[in-house]
A protein has these predicted regions:
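Active-site-adjacent structural elements that line small-molecule/cofactor binding pockets in enzymes
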Residues: 1-106
């Protein structure tokens, strides 16, 4: 999910949103790295705390638990696998894991 957070925080229009959540400096670093087309620096500029603030990641049990907590305050969610800066084969693995974790009956 680091790549997804990096992608969205690289968009200047979202900078105020990230700043309001306490991640303005990190968003600035990602925006600067994106301008240089430095993907590695973009990913490095996103700390773990930023990933966990804006995305759900972890083991299947951790993801289910976190999503269940989010449903307590959300009336809708869009859940998608990591897709930015991820190899296509890896994206397919993540997509399968997401379906198996959240959408298949136990």
């Amino acid at each position: 999910m680091r790549g997804t957070v990096a992608f969205y925080s690289s968009i200047a229009q979202y900078r105020k949103y990230y700043a309001a959540q306490g991640f303005g400096a990190q968003a600035d670093a990602v925006i600067a790295a994106a301008a240089r087309k430095d993907t590695a620096a973009m990913l490095k500029a996103v700390p773990d705390e930023m990933v966990t603030t804006f995305a759900v990641a972890g083991t299947p049990d951790e993801v289910r638990e976190r999503v269940a907590k989010l449903w307590q305050c959300a009336d809708s969610m869009t859940l998608s696998p990591p897709q930015y800066f991820v190899a296509p084969a890896r994206f397919n693995e993540y997509r399968t894991a997401l379906v198996e974790t959240l959408y298949q009956a136990a």
